[in-house]
């Protein structure tokens, strides 16, 4: 969202730090099941889709599943199965509030599924319409905005991207390759947090703050 906003309104943004960003996720990773489940074709009643998505999101007391659309296969030490739809993440049991064992990512998602009727439809909508996949064209506009600074048409000088080393959703090597191609190698800087997965922003807040501090100093 931040990258898309900046591509449309470059004059309003001086600096941009993206943490495990969507946008450049390659469509080739999405299985036919997710394509069908999140499609707007009308082949499945919306009530069925909501029920199926809720079951996929619900973790229960012992297991924690990824809440992202899954790719065909992933080979990553953080997960226990080859299909991301069945991937089990230990980090989903990470407490959001220190000292509160009931504030884990999985527990919060479960609570919303049970008590917030708008949560699942909102999640489905975000997957369908948010700029998650194949937004390379808009990212190239970001790169052009940076190149146009000398012409007075933008303020953004550099993009900082923070990635989890073992993130099976925002695949480090792919994002680095595609972001450099879209933005220009000299316009983007990467920080790979060693040992972190997709929940890097939750588990490694100190590393995120350090990158923000560096970026603010540069701006």
Regions found by a protein language model. Name each.
Residues 140-196:
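Conserved loop-alpha-helix segment in the C-terminal half of the alpha/beta-hydrolase fold
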């Amino acid at each position: 969202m931040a990258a898309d906003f900046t591509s449309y309104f470059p004059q309003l943004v001086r600096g941009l730090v993206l943490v495990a960003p969507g946008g450049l996720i390659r469509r080739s990773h999405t299985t036919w099941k997710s394509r069908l489940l999140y499609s707007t074709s009308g082949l499945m009643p919306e009530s069925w889709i909501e029920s199926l998505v809720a079951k996929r999101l619900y973790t229960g007391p012992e297991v924690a599943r990824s809440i992202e659309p899954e790719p065909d296969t992933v080979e990553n030490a953080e997960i226990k199965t080859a299909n991301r739809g069945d991937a089990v993440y230990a980090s989903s049991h990470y407490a959001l509030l220190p000292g509160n064992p009931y504030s884990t990512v999985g527990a919060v998602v479960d609570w919303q599924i049970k008590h917030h009727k708008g949560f699942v439809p909102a999640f489905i909508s975000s997957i369908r319409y948010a700029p998650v996949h194949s937004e390379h064209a808009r990212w190239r506009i970001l790169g052009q905005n940076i190149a146009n600074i000398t012409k007075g048409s933008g303020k953004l000088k550099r993009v900082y991207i923070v990635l989890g080393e073992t993130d099976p959703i925002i695949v480090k090597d792919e994002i680095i390759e595609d972001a450099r191609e879209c933005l220009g190698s000299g316009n983007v800087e990467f920080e790979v947090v060693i040992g972190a997965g997709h929940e890097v922003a939750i588990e490694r807040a100190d590393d995120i703050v350090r990158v923000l501090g560096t970026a603010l100093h540069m701006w």
